[in-house]
Amino acid sequence: MIKIRLTFSNDKKGLIEFAEALDNIKRTFNVLSVSKVYKGRGESKFSNVYIDVENK
């Protein structure tokens, strides 16, 4: 199992980039789980999502 952390900006462009990255990951790996979105601390403009994958 491999754990991937995706960090992306909290704006429309960042959400689009996140969705595209997740689609690419799904094409390459078997996705076991995707966490909820974790907002950055304080005034951070970024969020994180954790993805558990395994090789196809």
Protein language model regions, located:
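N-terminal acidic leader/helix
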Residues: 1-25, 33
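Short, intrinsically disordered low-complexity segments
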Residues: 34-56
